[in-house]
C-alpha cells in the first residue's frame, strides 16, 4: 500500500502511487465527506461500465447500500484522454455528481472503464465496493430472468436506504 497526501506527494510506502492517484485526489477534494476510496475492475460492475449501462435498483439489497441507480459517466473525448486521462476521469465523475449526493450514492461507473467507490473510511469504501459488485451481479441475473425487470418502487427504496443510513437509522447493531 502507498499513502499519498492531497498534494499527490507520497507519505509512506515503498511502491509507486497508482496511476489513478490524481483521480482519487480530485474526488477527495470535491467530496469532503469521503474518507476512503476503492477503484476496482470487478467483473459484473465493469460489464455495466463497458456496456454503458447504469445499474438500476431492482431490489432491497441494492437499496440498503445505494440510494438509487448507480450512475455512469459520459465518455471522455479523445482530447480529454490525450490532455490528462486521469485528471479528466476525475472531472467526468465530479460532473456526473452535479445533482447527486456522494454520501447517498458512494459509487460511479466510469464509461468503458470500471467503478470508483468510496465511503467514510477505507473499510467503508471496501464494503461499498463489495456491495456494488453484488448488486451488479444481481442486476445481470435479473436481466437473464426478465429482460425488463421492474424497478424497486421509490417508497421501498427510500425506506430501505434510510433505515440503514442517517441519524434515524434503525437497522443493524447499536454503535458504541
Language model features by range: what are they?
Residues 1-176:
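Glycine-rich flexible loops
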